[in-house]
Regions:
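ABC ATPase nucleotide-binding domains
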Residues: 88-247
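ATPase nucleotide-binding modules
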Residues: 244-272
Length: 272
């Protein structure tokens, strides 16, 4: 079977002529006197699995919520697939959002959870269930269609939430700490499932995480955030091998820092 080209294969961000799928320009979000996101500009390309990486309170989830429409920017613009989102409500954007809590309906079966959004929008039940069946195959949960969420493992619930987020075929899926509720072993297994699903569908994913290893494994590119700003954007190997600042080097970890100064000839000399 032919492999469909993804952003990971083509790396359009290396091409100055490539047109971004998402254009974020000078986005700022203030809550009173506190600036949560500070003048962020960012391009993301179609088919990417882009990670926003940073510690607690750095602004990454606020930036994600502004893309979804659940937070309104104080200033700046967000454009998705050529459309300015300034006056577009969350429910009319070509996006869907998956939360860390998964927010599954406990009284509904797996298949009814996935079908809920389709039926609510007026799709016929036979057509909706056909789409649900395709999603269940994709996330390998066909045998669990009639089970309730409490009868599933954490990893299975995560896949139900993912299927529900994708069944309406959004152009952009926003994932806020999607693996945060899983234990380490299950989180590592689920990372690769997430990559496979994203590449199969070709949907653009933006993932928020505080986990450096998760970002390095999942992403086509990473935007490292600190105090409301994006301090470095790059492919995982670039971020790891060439951190742009001491903060990035410390945050990514596994890096030896050597204090240097230049001598009179301009050569770098180690201190100490």
């Amino acid at each position: 079977m032919a492999h469909s080209a993804t952003a990971a294969d083509l790396k359009p961000w290396r091409d100055p002529a490539a047109e971004p799928f998402i254009k974020i320009r000078n986005i700022t979000k203030k809550f009173g006197d506190f600036t949560a996101v500070d003048n962020v500009s960012l391009d993301i390309f179609k088919g990417e699995l882009f990670c926003l990486l940073g510690g607690s309170g750095c602004g990454k989830s606020t930036l994600l919520r502004m893309m979804s429409g659940f937070e309104k920017p104080s200033s700046g613009t967000i454009e998705i697939d050529g459309q300015d989102m300034s006056n577009v409500s969350p429910y009319h954007r070509p996006t869907n959002m998956m939360f860390q809590s998964y927010a599954l309906f406990p009284h509904m079966s797996v298949e009814k959870n996935i079908a809920y959004g389709l039926l609510r929008e007026g799709m016929s039940k036979p057509e909706a269930m056909e789409k649900v069946a395709a999603m269940l195959r994709l996330v390998k949960l066909e045998k669990f269609a009639r089970r309730k969420p409490h009868q599933l493992s954490g990893g299975q619930r995560q896949r139900v939430a993912l299927a529900r987020s994708l069944v309406k075929k959004p152009k952009l899926l926003l994932l806020d700490e999607p693996l945060g509720a899983l234990d380490k072993k299950l989180r590592e297994e689920t990372q690769f499932e997430l990559i496979n699903i994203q590449e199969t569908l070709g949907v653009t994913f933006i993932v928020v995480t505080h986990d450096q290893e998760e970002a390095m494994t999942l992403s086509t590119r990473i935007g490292v955030m600190n105090e409301g700003e994006i301090v470095q954007i790059g492919e995982p190997t670039q971020i790891y091998e060439r951190p742009a600042s001491r903060f990035v080097a410390d945050f990514i970890g596994s890096t030896n820092l050597i204090d240097m100064e230049t001598d009179s000839t301009g050569r770098a000399v180690a201190l100490g």
